[in-house]
């Protein structure tokens, strides 16, 4: 069993999200629970509830976290923000590959998970659910 960490944990919310992504990748979304994530982080079972009210909210935070990381990486990869420049597409394509090589767990979480993939790829919901993607749609 994991040893419980002291109260001041650091960035617990980020660690909860990262551990939840790992659990979903390794065991599937049905195996994810707030209790399991707390154990993986070495905190009390009540600690995650300071950040997420339930499993669904944690999963939504995971999806949003990955989406923001990915969008930021892509946006930071291009120096010429002109979408008419053909080089921009090449740079974005290379950045896409680089990001998922660096963060393979995120790739698995998004594209090897039916529910996550369905939610992220629904363009009508992008504006409301993933505002970080809006600059990419222009």
Which residue ranges define each predicted feature?
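Short, structured helix-loop boundary elements
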Residues: 13, 34, 56, 60, ...
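N-terminal intrinsically disordered/low-complexity leader segments
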Residues: 1-11, 22, 82
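Amphipathic alpha-helical packing segments from all-alpha helical-bundle domains
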Residues: 75, 87, 119-138
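Hydrophobic/aromatic residues within well-ordered alpha-helical segments
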Residues: 55, 62, 66, 70, ...
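Amphipathic alpha-helical segments used for helix-helix packing
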Residues: 101-120
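Hydrophobic alpha-helical connector segments
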Residues: 61, 76-106
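Helix-turn-helix
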Residues: 15, 19, 23-57, 61
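Short hydrophobic clusters on alpha-helical segments that form packing/core surfaces
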Residues: 16-24, 66, 70, 74, ...
């Amino acid at each position: 069993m994991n040893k419980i960490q002291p109260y001041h944990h650091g960035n617990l919310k980020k660690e909860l999200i990262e551990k939840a992504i790992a659990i979903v990748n390794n065991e599937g979304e049905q195996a994810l629970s707030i209790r399991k994530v707390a154990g993986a982080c070495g905190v009390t079972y009540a600690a995650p509830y300071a950040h997420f009210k339930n499993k669904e909210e944690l999963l939504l935070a995971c999806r949003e976290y990955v989406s923001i990381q990915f969008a930021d990486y892509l946006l930071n990869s291009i120096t010429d923000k002109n979408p008419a420049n053909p080089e921009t597409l090449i740079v974005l394509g290379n950045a896409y590959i680089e990001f998922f090589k660096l963060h393979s767990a995120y790739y698995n979480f998004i594209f090897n998970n039916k529910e996550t993939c369905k939610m992220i790829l629904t363009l009508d919901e992008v504006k409301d659910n993933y505002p970080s993607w809006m600059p990419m749609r222009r």
